Structure formats: structure tokens, C-alpha cells
Amino acid sequence: MKFLKRGVALALLAAFALTTQPAQAYEKDKTYKITILHTNDHHGHFWRSEYGEYGLAAQKTLVDSIRKEVAQEGGSVLLLSGGDINTGVPESDLQDAEPDFRGMNLIGYDAMAVGNHEFDNPLTVLRQQEKWAKFPFLSANIYQKSTGERLFKPWAIFTRQDIKIAVIGLTTDDTAKIGNPEYFTDIEFRKPAEEAKVVIQELNMNEKPDVIIATTHMGHYDNGDHGSNAPGDVEMARSLPAGSLAMIVGGHSQDPVCMASENKKQVNYVPGTPCAPDKQNGIWIVQAHEWGKYVGRADFEFRNGEMKMVNYQLIPVNLKKKVTWDNGKSERVLYTPEIAENPQMLLLLTPFQNKGKAQLEVKIGSVNGLLEGDRSKVRFVQTNMGRVILAAQIARTGADFGVMSGGGIRDSIEAGDITYKSVLKVQPFGNIVVYADMSGKEVVDYLTAVAQMKPDSGAYPQFANVSFVAKEGKLTELKIKGEPVDPAKTYRMATLSFNATGGDGYPRIDNKPGYVNTGFIDAEVLKEFIQQNSPLDAAAFTPKGEVSWL
């Protein structure tokens, strides 16, 4: 092989460099206005809450007004979602989130990240949701194992005025752990930060966008301290070339990302007050809490290839606070002026709401006190809701004890009448109740492993008929139904198919000889237990310190 002379080689390199520079369509020294709107973790809340908060009808009114305002100033809007459209409201869940995606179409979403809860249903349902949606589902790091091909588009390109904007989608690689393993037999979740580096290089080489934004479902953790969760947006931003993304539109941790100081979010953000987004390594990071409670608004000025944020706010969507007056009476009042609901959206969504509501409002039982299922409790401590759910599974399977991850409990039940809707809000995932017969030694090994799951994660375990003291990775005083575990005895454990197949990092038990899949859906099992045991006494299920960590 002959080598090119140095002068010829340099000339060719220079020519190649010239041909690979971005074909800039924007005008030099002109300032363009670009507004990025964003939501995340919608979780089925297409309709207003019982207090008249959020909902897609009010969201459309708000977004339409912002579009009009920005257009009058000569600017452009891009509307993104950080994912998790699925799971959380029965009227939506029973209809596979069809009303939610059709409502998002009407609002005019441009793209969304694929969230972990998009996999709460089989892939066939997810593909149907893609057909309903008129915007792309983006994820660069989800692959089909058998083909090595991506399951979704890695990015989408949008032109706003003369500016070429690339939007990358990324999904937490925790999905394989916290999702239903039965749906992931041929799916691989690669490390999103590593995939982002590759995609950014590909974009800059081939598409040559003026701006790159990531819409992600990875979580925001202060200073990158992600604990037992997979690394999130902060960690990724720090790992990328400085400023290689203009911003990250996030989701998954379900926080208002409003910084109190460097690397520390506000603990109790007050709706309607100023919100300072995070910035790491020259990359803005935003997140709009959950459920459509807010629409995030980031106003940028683009000039000569540079994106400068000039304004950011979280706009509450009819959020209310409870106020108690001097006479002892209380009411819920708006934080900010009311946003009217869009009539066209109401016309679209009302039939869906009525269809779902009719199936859910029938009373199935009652309880005399609160059954605690709030996220801030079930991921940190034992609760009476956990005990009720496991009692139902134990009763159905004839088990000696029960275990499940706290992240599978999604809501509380207030004192009073209980409807099927209440049950489905608590257990919306449609997991199957299973059981396994294990030796006492296997029980000790299993519970020792599960007890290592840390608080502040969905993996934190809820127990029933189990007591122990955990210290330095070992269990002492381990008892089942008040009796010390006999290594030679056989015990039956009830749990969910999700945990049995390794969900949330739990030891797999579906390969054990004594494993049985009952085929009964968790919410149906809980519903029948409530029907048979009502009125429930909430205090009878209150944990009494049976399990403790030192």
C-alpha cells in the first residue's frame, strides 16, 4: 500500500472536516426563542382528581395558552414526556391507558421516553399504545436480545424555526429488576449513560443537530447518591462531555427538581413558588413531579449555536392545599388561579371515564381506620396495608407466611366504604399470587437475602407472620408464626409472581420443585379477602415491631 504524501493527506482531512460541519440553517447573530414544556410519571391520571386537581383537560388549556404566548413572541414549543404513562388509576388501567395516549395526542406531545411502567403490560399492549400515540416512544438503550436490535427509536429530530433539535430517549436499566421478569425474557436494558455517549456521537456525525436534548426515565438523585437504585440523570450528566446535552427532561423518581442549594433539592416544594432546576456539567436537569400536577416550562434563547436558559418554572395544574379556618372547618383552596378544562378534551375523555367508573364504584367492604399504603411509608417501614395484602395471599394459598416488596403497594385506603377501585389503586399491576414450599433452611436463606433490601426503594420488603432481628447481614430470633424456624420443617410462603421471578432483585423461587403459580390476580385476591372479612379492623393489622434492623 502506498501512503499519501503528508500535504495531500492534510488537504483531504481538511476537506472532510469541512463536509462534516453542521449544515447550519439558522441565521448568524439572530436570537431564536425555544420553549421546552415537559411532564413525567403520568400514571393514568387522564381525569381530574377527586378534588378537581390536574387532569389532561386542564393541562391542554394550559399548554394551549403557552403555545399562543410563545408564538406571539416569535418562538417555538417542544412538548416532551419523561414516561410512565401507565399504571396507577383503575379507569386508565382497565383500558390499557388508551384515554391517556389519545388525550396526549390532543394536547400535542412531540415525544416521550419509555418508562419502566410501560412494561407493566405485555409487549403486545405496548405496541398497541404506540399505535394509539401520534408521537414517538423513545429509548436508545432497550434491545431485543435475540436480534441485537433496538426495540424503540433511539431519537427523534424536530425542526423549530431554523433550528434542528435532536431528542434522545433513555430508560432506567433498573427496569429489568423492578419490572415483571416474565415480560423481559428477550429484552435487554443496557446502561443508559454508556448508550447516551454512543448516540450523541452518532447524532453529531450523521444528523448534525444544533441542539441535543435527552428525555429520560432514570430518576434524579441529589449529588448522584442513588443508593440501591440504578444511576440517574445526575450521574449521567457528569459522565458525558460537558454541555453535550442542552438539558435532560427527566422522570422516574417523581420529584419536583427544584434545588435549594448545590446538589440538594428542596424538601417540600410549595406549588407556585420559584423553582431552580439542577445543572450538572453544563447540562440542565428538570423533572415535573408526577401525575400531571405540573407542567414544566423552560424558556431558552438560541443564538449562534448556543442555548441559554432565560426562565424556568413549574406551573401547577389546579393544585390545592387544605386550609383549616378558625371555626374548625376546612376546605381545599387553589395555590394559583384556576385553569379551566378544555371542552374538546372533556368530550374525548368523558366516555372513557364513564366506562371505567361504572365497573369500579360498587362497594365490596369497609374498614374502620386508615390502611397505610403511601409511598413514603411502605418503602421505609412495615404497614398495616402490607399486612392486609399478605393476609389475603396467605388465606388464598394456605401459606405460613408472606413476603412482598413495598413498591408493589401503590396507595392507601381511607376509613369507610371500600370499592374495587380502591383495591385496584393499591395493587394496579395485575401480578399473580404464587407460593412455594421450602425447607426451614431455604426459608432462612431466603429471608436473610430479602432482609438486605434497603429502605427508600421499591424493594424494601413487607412481611406477615415473620419476626426477626437483622444485624450486619444476618438474622437472629427468626420465627414463623411466633415459632423458631425448624431447618428440617417445610414451610409455605406466599408472594407475587413479580418477586418470585426475581423482581426487585429478590431471590428467584419459580424454579423450586414446590413452586405453584395459582393464576389468581393479586387485586382480585385482595378484593375477595375484603369481601369475606368486612368490616376490617385496621388496628388488628398494625405491625408491632416484629421485624427490626440494627
Where are these regions (language model features)?
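Active-site-adjacent helix-turn-beta-strand microarchitecture at beta-sheet edges
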Residues: 26-48, 78, 86-190, 226-359, ...
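Short, high-confidence coil segments that cap the C-terminus of an alpha-helix
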Residues: 74-76, 109, 208-209, 398-399
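Gram-negative bacterial Sec-dependent N-terminal signal peptides
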Residues: 2-22
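Short acidic/His/Gly/Ser-rich catalytic and metal-binding motifs that mark active-site loops
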Residues: 174-179, 223-224, 413, 503-504
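Feature captures C-terminal
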Residues: 32-35, 45-58, 134-141, 145-146, ...
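Hard-cation-handling environments
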Residues: 307-418
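Signal peptide-proximal N-terminal region
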Residues: 60-77, 204
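Short catalytic helix/loop segments, enriched in acidic residues and glycine
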Residues: 52-65, 101, 105, 188-196
